[in-house]
Amino acid sequence: MRKKVLFICALFGEISAFATQEPKTLNLENGCIEAVFDAKNGALIRVTDKKSGWEIMKREALGQSFEMLLPMEGTQMTQADRRYNVVKGIKQDNPEIKQADNKITFIWKGLKSDFMDQKADITFKGEVRLTDKGLEYSGEVINNSQLPIEYVSWPCIGEVTVPDKTQPLYHSTRNDQRELFPHFFNQHGYWGVDYPTSTYVLPEKSFLQVNDRERGFMVYHREMPKYMTITSFELIPGYEIRGVNPYEDEIDGEMVRIQFKANHIIFNKPGETSELDPIQFIIYKGDWTKGVDLYRNDRIALTAHQRDTDPKWLDSPLTWRKISIGNGKDLVRYGKEALKGGVDVLLVSGWYRIENGHVLEVLGLEDAITECQSQGIRVVLETNWTTVDRHSAGYRENFRKYVMVDPFDMPYNFHNICPNTPNIQKWVKSEWLKLPALHMADGYMNSDFNHNNKSFMCFDKFHQHRLGEPTLNGIMKIDAEMAKNLAGNTEKVALGQGFVDYQNDIYNGYLVNASDNFYALHRYMDTLIPIMLRVEVRNARKAMNEALLNRMNIVYDLNFFNDNLEDYPNIVKYGNQIEDLRNKYAGYLWNATFNEHHGASVQGNNLEYAVFITKSGKRAVVVVNKSVNDNSKAEVVLDNGKALVYATPESQESKTFNGSVELAPLSAVVIMEK
């Protein structure tokens, strides 16, 4: 009997100890993703894409939580100074952890690096929330120390595994693509980083996409962020041979991995509190379009600045011409050429100059605009609110003090003036809005300086903005206010040059500024917004075919040996044929939804194609032979077996399509469901 009592007591003791034992891990999990965190130090130790089975992060020993840069530097840069003073989250005291309602909150207090003698009075509260598609990271930094905080890495993922080593793994944005595996692109030079490193800037690049042919994940901000974020990948410990990733899991006892960080550039000063911009970590299964679908459907528009109307004339397929003038007579001459050559819109530069702090129109511009418009030619003026000529009269007195400077007080360049400066914001409105031509023209296209010379932020102490204020914040403020003030009537357009896709909430369209490899991505991100594509002399036919493929307006930029339109008869003829084709079959090619490659199969050498879906659900396939020398036989199959017809820019009457067609070099064909 005594033995039974002792056994029962021991059993209950074990159960009690088990019941009170703290869990070793904390999970956020749904049918899409599983994220596992260390319950003591807060490190992310596993991430699994449950739909594809991709173990994005799987080696627990590589778990990371956050990083923070606290530069320790004085005016003399003594031996005690250390600019690269990185606080690593996994080396801090264990955080306070709270879990509730699909969210985990980690609170780290008193931060210290290996180079600091004592803890800094800094609190970092990091939150991870489970969403229906993945994770959302947000946070708050409270700095009561004497040290500045330049960035916070959150999330910080210790490894991004390669899901299938038989195919490449890429990281890309709306304008760029690089390999992560098997070749890792070292963007910053061997002298500037500890490991091969590749970075992209958000929100300028819209999103970060990591993918192979079958799966991927997206990193992006849903709303326009306050701070700049630099996403970074590091190949640790380095290359197997030049530019090539190691295939092994370890090299000389060092774990091989690709480490990922989202670095929030906050430039927090002592005594400040900074809220991190929420950032999404979203997973998907499928090709790249599935990831872009998630981004474009999830991004929140700038409703506070959203454009009120879209001019109806911009909805039609139009042929544009980019010109530069010195006076009103030049514009009249170009207008007459446009009338003969089938050009609908003139995109005009050179129409103003800046002298002694004032923006001045060229002579005769207003009458010239009126004359062009009377002949049915629309006039759109190119603008650049915050770029000035350093050699112009009055530059030093009016603009030199407003150039943007880096953290060491050195100008990035001398022609981009700071858009975050209140005085410049007032100058832009007072000088540009007084110009009659801007109000008379059919619209304007503004060219922001697109971070020329790495001018991402300004650190001038006398510009009346926060040190390290992102350039984009000032640009967006000026762009929105100018668009509102110049709206005029429902037929006036405001256009940009694709600097950041949040501008599409302000502007009616944009001139694409990317390589032709990314035209389809730009079009897929917004299938209907007007996009213009520059056509230069030496690649004219290729570029016009790209415009046809991607539902973009042709913009002639013809100045190879002169600027007379009649001296480029073949280019003009093909451009007119494309516009006529798009007008004839507008329901298939223009008033239709771009669907990339989905819904059709095209076989043949040197071919590119795009699928369009009409409002009634019918499909059209545009096929282009990209070879400059060889014919190509295009075999096209649509999966529903309906009767098909085809037409070309040169022969626009539809003919029965019997499954294949021969395409001459640099030629196009449209296959349509009847």
Where are these regions (language model features)?
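Sec-dependent N-terminal signal peptides
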Residues: 5-13
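Hydrophobic faces of well-ordered beta-strands that scaffold small-molecule active sites
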Residues: 319-321, 346-348, 379-383, 444-446, ...
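Active-site-proximal substrate-binding groove within the catalytic cores of carbohydrate-active enzymes
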Residues: 42, 272, 476-650, 663-669, ...
